[in-house]
Amino acid sequence: DQDFYVSKSNEFAFKLLNSWPKWEKNFVNLIGEKFSGKTHLINIFLEKFKGIKIEANEINNEFLKKIKVFENIIIENFNDKIDENLLFTLLNIIDQDNKYLILTSKNPIVDHSFKLNDLNSRSKNFLLCNIEKPGDDLMFALILKNLSDRQISIDKKLVDFIIKRIDRSY
C-alpha cells in the first residue's frame, strides 16, 4: 500500500476499491493497460478485505466450488479465451450469494462480444472503473521509484526533462 502512488489517473480506482463494501454494484470491472497498477491495487484490496484471486483462463469447476467460503472474488486478466459457461455460472453464484467480483481487463467487459447472449446482458451490470494514462505527477513518481529501486540518483530537473518527452503509457 505504501509504495502505490495515488494520482489523478488512478484515484477513482483506488477510492472505489477502498470503499468496499459500499459499492453501487457487486460487479466491478477494473480496466487499464498493462503495467497500469491493476494487480497492485488488487493485492492492496486482498490484503485489506480478503478474498480469492484467479487468472481468467484458469477458471474451472473446482474453482467454482472453492469460492463458496469467500465474499470477494477476483478474476485477473479477462480475455476472449475465458470459458463463457463457467463465467456465467460464476456470475450467477456471486449474484445469488451476494458476493463481490472484481474483474481486471485491458478493455471494458461491456465491449466484449460473448457467444452467450445472457453474458452480453450481464456484462452491462458491471461498474466500470478505468485507470487512465499517467499524468506528469505519476510519471515523475514512477521514474523516481524505478531509479531508486536500482539505487540510481538523478537530478529532478532531468526527470522533468524526461517527462516532457516520454510516451504516456505504463
Where are these regions (language model features)?
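Dynamic helix-loop-helix/coil hinge segments at AAA+ ATPase domain boundaries and subdomain interfaces
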Residues: D1-F12
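Walker A/P-loop nucleotide-binding motif
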Residues: K25-L41
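Conserved AAA+ ATPase "SRH/arginine-finger" region at the nucleotide-binding site
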Residues: D111-H112, F126-L138
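Short conserved motifs of the RecA-like P-loop NTPase core
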Residues: S153-R165
